[in-house]
Amino acid sequence: MAADPTTGGGEAESFFRAAPPLRDQDRVAGDLADFVARHSGSGGGGRLAGVVCVTSGGTTVPLEQRCVRYIDNFSSGQRGAASTEYFLKAGYAVIFIYRRGSKQPYCRFLPEDSFLDLFELGEESDIQVPESHAAVVKTAIRNYRKAIDEGLLLKLPFTTIFEYLQLLQMVGTAMNCLGRQGMFYLAAAVSDFYVPWESMAKHKIESASGPLNMQLNQVPKMLFILRKQWAPSAFCVSFKLETDPDILLQKAEAALRKYGMNVVVANELANYKDVVVMVTSNGRTTVRRPSKEDDVEEQLIDLLVEMHSEHIMQLNQDVHKLT
């Protein structure tokens, strides 16, 4: 029987208790605390629009503790990388939780071939960027360095479902102090099933043993816990991807109610780059990519920024009424 997400965090607590410790956990916690402290109180009349946590890429489910084999989720990280760029452009500070090896902000337009194809040797064996790539490389470096140098981008990598959910918990609790200034934009493709760490084989599973039968557990639904416990005042956006268009919007609306999201972005695998549907308690809004040269994320982020601003302003209005 599937667990009811509204019954509390018992399954989540068991998941975290059994999970292998996050690598560099103390360093990550310190970086998070510094980043959030730097940007807390910057909203309202300040320059910063808010702080958003963008999750991107797919999680893996290891089948062995010393992992050789794993189950993967489809996601290139394109949406998360593009959205991060547009959030930065809109004046947000961004915590970017991303799958190692996935698309990165400002690198989406670089060639997908070997990294070495971006460079060539000059006459004196100095390294140069070919003219064909020079403009896009310069733009990528300029924009990326600006975000890093101004302290507006914090990147936190993951590979496994264990790493991802531990990072999400750490970021959620760290951003709680931001109140409504915080936003979560949960574009990562998160595994629905996993092998509990204590149930895994320690070493590589032997193929000589014959067919493999494996029991997978459901991953605890952390969206409800994020919304109700870790960062209850934040503006929360989740995504629903389906291959069957007949059930997509129905499932998106169910997720909106079930997990208390502010927005669920529904997208179909066949055309996810071209069109998405924003599902809210007030109805549906279809967002389309204007042309092949544009990103659907640009229009999507513009709408979400406006909604987040209204979310923040609502608190200010409530406070004003009390005073």
UniProtKB/Swiss-Prot annotation:
EC numbers, comma separated: 6.3.2.5
Any one of the GO BP annotations: coenzyme A biosynthetic process
Keyword Repeat carried by entry: no
UniProtKB keywords: Coenzyme A biosynthesis, Ligase
Subunit structure: Homodimer.
Enzyme class: ligase
Annotated family: Belongs to the PPC synthetase family.
Pfam families documented for this protein: DFP
InterPro entries, sorted: CoaB-like_sf, DNA/pantothenate-metab_flavo_C
Reactions mediated catalytically: (R)-4'-phosphopantothenate + L-cysteine + CTP = N-[(R)-4-phosphopantothenoyl]-L-cysteine + CMP + diphosphate + H(+)
Pathway stated in the Swiss-Prot or TrEMBL entry: Cofactor biosynthesis; coenzyme A biosynthesis; CoA from (R)-pantothenate: step 2/5
The name this protein goes by in its record: Phosphopantothenate--cysteine ligase 2
Taxonomic superkingdom: Eukaryota
GO MF entry, a single one: phosphopantothenate--cysteine ligase activity
Annotated source species: Oryza sativa subsp. japonica
Physiological role: Catalyzes the first step in the biosynthesis of coenzyme A from vitamin B5, where cysteine is conjugated to 4'-phosphopantothenate to form 4-phosphopantothenoylcysteine.
